[in-house]
Amino acid sequence: MNRHTARELAFKALFGLDFAPEKTLDTLESLWAEKIAEGKIPPEKLVDFSRELVRGVIEKKERLDEIIRRRAIGWDFKRLAKVDKTLLRLALYEMLYRPDIDIPVSIDEAVELAKVYGEEESPKFINGILGYVAEHIDEFWEES
């Protein structure tokens, strides 16, 4: 198991954030329990990493959504695909609040997850927004 798996489980838990925010951490714990039941015992640091991502996105959701609204030019935020919105929140959280994670890694992970869980255009859409933020990261750090 690696950080990709931890991110994927954080993504799955956060996907329900718009529907039942109070259950998001419970969902994450259930996902980890499934992995353990499959005989895949995760290192505690990966479990902690995914918990921190979920808690961080929940805490900073308003700010992350503001950035998405600003950069999703021509898109109605409410009509954005939930997968795309969730992946953007997760990657933006890493980019803005986890300086220990290289920005290209956060972008690549979001794009790879979009290829699996998103629609055909999701990887391109996500890469475009995150690429812009990466190019102007100093501005976004100042605002955060």
From Swiss-Prot:
GO CC field: cytosol
SUPFAM superfamilies linked to this entry: NusB-like
UniProt keyword annotations, A-Z: RNA-binding, Transcription, Transcription antitermination, Transcription regulation
Entries under InterPro entries matching the protein: NusB-like_sf, NusB_fam, NusB_RsmB_TIM44
GO biological process: DNA-templated transcription termination; transcription antitermination
Keyword NADP: no
A family per Pfam: NusB
GO MF term set: RNA binding
Keyword Cytoplasm: no
Function: Involved in transcription antitermination. Required for transcription of ribosomal RNA (rRNA) genes. Binds specifically to the boxA antiterminator sequence of the ribosomal RNA (rrn) operons.
NCBIfam families xrefs: nusB
The family this protein is said to belong to: Belongs to the NusB family.
Name of the protein: Transcription antitermination protein NusB
Organism per entry: Carboxydothermus hydrogenoformans (strain ATCC BAA-161 / DSM 6008 / Z-2901)
